[in-house]
């Protein structure tokens, strides 16, 4: 599956920013994700962006890693003074406690459960004590409600709060969690999406946040 992921994102690299985030749908998600990261990370900390892609969220890290050479090439053009490398998240070769924090967006939705467990352990080794790991995964509750089933590896993974706690309990403590895209963005007319966003942000922090499309988890290393 790794080769499929690599090839998929290599093929998308040139048009990725434009097609995924250069429209009102992508902007909607980008605003929500940035809002959450800003709450927890300082841009001058020694942070690692795992699966950094074209560098969309690299303003919060000095280091980035991605499996796609073509995505990394674009990230380097956008952030020439940052340490960005091609690599596999399951084979991170950094010293223990090298980073203050780490984060990863739009990666875990593609992986299998056994890979998640391995990654949580690996990241716990390279992040210092009390450091944060911020990540997003599709909401299992939302998909159960909408009866959504992915037809390929892309975005297939999903998880709920109890499962997340179980597979991270050995190395991480859950600090908080937030929703992303509570409302089905594709059903909201483009002209009014920016007006719906504040209400969406509110719902993503409410008692109903687990019903959002994705959940962003804030973990602290034990």
Please state what every model-predicted region is.
Residues 1-41:
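Conserved class I S-adenosyl-L-methionine
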Residues 48, 53-91:
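Class I SAM-dependent methyltransferase SAM/SAH-binding core
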Residues 103:
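A conserved beta-strand element that flanks and buttresses the S-adenosyl-L-methionine
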Residues 106-110:
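Short catalytic micro-motifs in class I SAM-dependent methyltransferases
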Residues 117-129:
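A short glycine-rich, Lys/Arg-flanked "PGG" loop and its adjoining helix->strand segment in the class I
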Residues 130-137:
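Conserved beta-strand signature within the Rossmann-like core of class I S-adenosyl-L-methionine
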Residues 147-163:
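Acceptor-substrate binding/catalytic loop of class I
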Residues 176-222:
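A C-terminal cap/extension of S-adenosyl-L-methionine-dependent methyltransferases
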């Amino acid at each position: 599956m790794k080769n499929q992921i690599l090839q998929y994102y290599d093929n998308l690299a040139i048009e990725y920013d434009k097609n995924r985030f250069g429209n009102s749908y992508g902007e909607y998600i980008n605003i929500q994700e940035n809002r959450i990261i800003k709450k927890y990370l300082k841009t001058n900390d020694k942070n690692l962006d795992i699966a950094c892609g074209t560098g969309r969220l690299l303003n919060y890290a000095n280091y980035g890693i991605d499996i796609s050479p073509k995505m990394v090439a674009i990230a380097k053009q956008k952030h020439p003074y940052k340490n960005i490398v091609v690599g596999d998240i399951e084979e991170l070769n950094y010293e223990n406690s090298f980073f203050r924090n780490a984060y990863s967006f739009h990666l875990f939705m593609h992986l299998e459960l056994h890979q998640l467990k391995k990654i949580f352990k690996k990241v716990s080794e390279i992040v210092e004590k009390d450091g944060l790991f911020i990540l997003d995964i599709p909401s299992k509750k939302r998909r159960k409600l909408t009866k959504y089933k992915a037809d390929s590896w892309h975005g297939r993974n999903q998880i709920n709060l109890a499962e997340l706690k179980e597979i991270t309990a050995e190395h991480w403590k859950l600090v908080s969690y937030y929703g992303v895209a509570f409302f089905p963005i594709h059903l909201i007319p483009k002209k009014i999406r920016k007006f719906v966003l504040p209400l969406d942000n509110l719902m993503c922090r409410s008692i109903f946040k687990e019903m959002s499309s994705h959940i962003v988890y804030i973990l602290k290393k034990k």
